[in-house]
Amino acid sequence: MVAAMVAALRGPSRRFRPRTRALTRGTRGAASAAGGQQSFDLLVIGGGSGGLACAKEAAQLGKKVAVADYVEPSPRGTKWGLGGTCVNVGCIPKKLMHQAALLGGMIRDAHHYGWEVAQPVQHNWKTMAEAVQNHVKSLNWGHRVQLQDRKVKYFNIKASFVDEHTVRGVDKGGKATLLSAEHIVIATGGRPRYPTQVKGALEYGITSDDIFWLKESPGKTLVVGASYVALECAGFLTGIGLDTTVMMRSIPLRGFDQQMSSLVTEHMESHGTQFLKGCVPSHIKKLPTNQLQVTWEDHASGKEDTGTFDTVLWAIGRVPETRTLNLEKAGISTNPKNQKIIVDAQEATSVPHIYAIGDVAEGRPELTPTAIKAGKLLAQRLFGKSSTLMDYSNVPTTVFTPLEYGCVGLSEEEAVALHGQEHVEVYHAYYKPLEFTVADRDASQCYIKMVCMREPPQLVLGLHFLGPNAGEVTQGFALGIKCGASYAQVMQTVGIHPTCSEEVVKLHISKRSGLEPTVTGCUG
C-alpha cells in the first residue's frame, strides 16, 4: 500500500491517474477563485493533525468545510506536504529513526541469541532517510485523498485575517484568495525556536524541521537544548553510530518528573551520548573545511571553550505559528509572553466564533493525540449537538529516548507540591527486562514509580515507566488512572508474564520505607 502511494506521488500509474487528476483539479479550482470570495460553514487554518481531524469530522456531519494550509520553508529551505509537524517533522519520522537505532542495538545483541552477524555493523543514512521520507510522502498523499473523499476544499495558501469572518490567502505564485466562514478554527501549530542572540545560529544551524529531510548523514552533531526533542534526536543519532553531544543550559526534560529525567540522561551518557552541562553557545563560525566551530561559555567555570562539529541542531523549544495571521484584525487575544492564543474550555478565543486548538493554543499539551481529540470534539459541539468538552487531565505521553520514558498523571514533584509530602506515597522498583539478560545489557536505569495518595484508598496520581516499549506499557495503565484507579486495584491486577509491564502491578516497596527497590527474581 505504501509503495503504491509513493509510486503515485513520484509519477502516478494508470490506476491512480483519475484520483490524481481530481486532486489537481481541486487545487486549480481553489487557485482560480482568487477573484471572488468563497463561503463555508467551517474554515480551518492549518493542515496538521488537529486541524485535519476537525475538518474531516465537520464534513462527516454534512457541513461545507475548507482547509487552508501553507508550509513556510525553514531557514535552511526545508519544506514538506500536508499533515503538519507530527507527520512531516515530528512523531512519525522521529519514531522511525528511533526504531533504526533500536535495530542497531538488536543486531549487536544478535550473536548472543545464535545469529552469526558480522561485526561491526554499518548504518547507511541515505537508505534510512529515503525510506522514512517516502513513508512521510505517502501520508501526505493519504491526507489529500481523505480530504477529497470527504469533499473538504483544500487551499494551499498562506492565510491571514481580514476581519473576524474573512481570511485572505496567498498561494506560492502570489495569487490571492478570499475565504469567509461562519466558524473559523486556528490550528497552525508551532515551529522550532532559533537562538537569535547566538551569532551564526540562523546561518549554520538546523532544527527538527530539517534533520529528518537531510539527504546526507549529519555526521558529528551538537544538539543544543534539553527538551524531549533534543534528547530524542541525540538518542537516535548516537544509536546509529554518530558522534553526538548534547549541550544543556540547565535541567533536562523540564516539566517532567526530574528523577526520571536524570535517569534518562544517565542512560544516554552511559551509552555514548556526550553531555555539556551548564553550557551556553555564544557563536558559530564556518571553517574552510565546511565544519562548524562552536564557541560556548561554561557557567560552572566561567570559561569559554570551543568544539568542531559537522552539524549543529537547535532544540531549545518551539514558538506558535501566529506571526503572519494578523490576529489583531479579527480581535483575537494572545498571551504577550509566548504569543499563544488564549482559549477557554470550549477552545473559543476572545472572538466567540473563532477557535484555536493544538500547539497554538495557550495552556494545551503540545501533543498530537490531544489536538486530534480536541479537534473532533470541537466539530461535534459546533455541528453535532454535542456538549462534550476535551478533558486535558491525565494525558499520557512518552519520550522516545534510547531507553523510553512513558508517563501519565502527576510527577512526584507536582504531587508533593499539590498535596504535601506527608500525604504522598511513592512506590518504586528497578527491574531488568528478560530480553536484556541473555545479551547482558545494562539495565541500571530501568525503573518504575507510582505516585499515590498516602491515605486509603490510595488514589494513583501518576505513573512513570523507564524501559523498553514505554509507550505501549503506559497506554494501558493510562486508562486505569483516567478511571480513578487506586493502588490496591493495581495490586489486585494480574500481570502478564514475562513482560516489563507486569512489574507495575508488583510495586510494593515505598520510598518512605527506605527498603532497596530492586526486583530480585523474574518469577517472584
Swiss-Prot record:
Cofactor(s) it depends on: FAD
Entry superkingdom: Eukaryota
Subcellular location(s) of the protein: Mitochondrion
Enzyme Commission numbers on file: 1.8.1.9
Binding site for FAD: 41-70
Cross-link (Cysteinyl-selenocysteine (Cys-Sec)): 522-523
Residues that bear N6-succinyllysine: 79, 175, 329
MF terms in GO: flavin adenine dinucleotide binding; protein homodimerization activity; thioredoxin-disulfide reductase (NADPH) activity
Range of residues in the leader sequence: none
Keywords: Disulfide bond, FAD, Flavoprotein, Mitochondrion, NADP, Oxidoreductase, Redox-active center, Selenocysteine, Transit peptide
GO cellular component: mitochondrion
Catalytic activity: [thioredoxin]-dithiol + NADP(+) = [thioredoxin]-disulfide + NADPH + H(+)
Cysteine disulfide partners in this protein: 86-91
Transit peptide feature range: 1-34
Enzyme class: oxidoreductase
One annotated GO biological process: cell redox homeostasis
Organ and tissue specificity: Expressed in liver, heart, testis and kidney.
Residues annotated as catalytic: 497
Subunit text: Homodimer.
NCBIfam families hit by this protein: TGR
Further comment: The active site is a redox-active disulfide bond. The selenocysteine residue is also essential for catalytic activity.
Family stated for the protein in its record: Belongs to the class-I pyridine nucleotide-disulfide oxidoreductase family.
Record's function text: Involved in the control of reactive oxygen species levels and the regulation of mitochondrial redox homeostasis. Maintains thioredoxin in a reduced state. May play a role in redox-regulated cell signaling.
Stated name of the protein: Thioredoxin reductase 2, mitochondrial
Native source organism of the sequence: Mus musculus (Mouse)
Gene of this entry: Txnrd2
